[in-house]
Amino acid sequence: MKIGLIGFGKTGKSVASILLENNKFCLEWVLRQSTVLEHRSVPEFFGVQSDEPGLIYSSSKTSIEELLNKHPVDVIIDFSSNEGIYTYGEIAAERKVKIISAISHYKEKELQLLKKLANKTTVFWSPNITLGVNYLLFAAKFLKKIAPWVDIEVNEEHFKKKQGTSGTAVKIAEALDIDKNNINSVRAGGIVGKHEVIFGFPYQTVRLIHESISREAFGNGVVFVAENLENKQKGLYNFEDILTPYFTV
């Protein structure tokens, strides 16, 4: 499966390293805003031997259309920003290139665009693409269904410079139908990401906790999603769509 990666920040780099390790995927190229590292290869950047091209391009000098003409891919993985979808979405959808977006925050306008693109190709979006946190969300919804009256609080912890409430915490609150004021945020040091859902019963407490140890967790999530989207028809998918069949008895 040929992959194009949008975004090469800390998380993008971690995702790229995981893709290079998996022989089911071929990292064809990386597109980023900066001209730093332009025309170098990802394997060279990591100092590893690989047959995968993984060439790095700058969006200021190379258009997505030009890139897809020269190096067609099956899937585009987006770890850039909420604005990124405007640079490649329409072109990718026209060419039936699958889209996996791991952008934590989208405005309503971008969400509507994703729905529009899903009429032409397979689109997946999750504000947190790690497997573990989506297992947590799945289990939390199940518990809420059993005890809809239970008190629920959400705690989230991230690195010092992360601004605003995490998209994952917001999604958890929305999925459990609780007020966003029930989200408690901590910013300290280099915490990659930790989410805790507390269910307060009268005589007992249930805590569901997920903690990302390193950003490679996002890469493992990408691999899982890409494998499960391979035979999916056009449409807009989320993690619940992919996980539900695994829980069917």
Q: Locations of the language-model features?
A:
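Rossmann-fold NAD(P) dinucleotide-binding segment
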Residues: 65-75, 79-101
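Short, ordered loop/turn segments at secondary-structure junctions
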Residues: 104-106, 128-130, 157-159
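Rossmann-fold NAD(P)-binding glycine/threonine-rich loop
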Residues: 83, 88-90, 103-123, 134, ...
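C-terminal substrate-binding/catalytic lobe of Rossmann-fold NAD(P)-dependent oxidoreductases
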Residues: 2, 6, 10-67, 148-249
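Structural motif
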Residues: 6, 79-80, 102, 126
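Short alpha-helices
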Residues: 129-138
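Rossmann-fold dehydrogenase core element
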Residues: 98, 113-130, 147-150
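A charged, well-structured terminal subsegment
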Residues: 138, 142-150
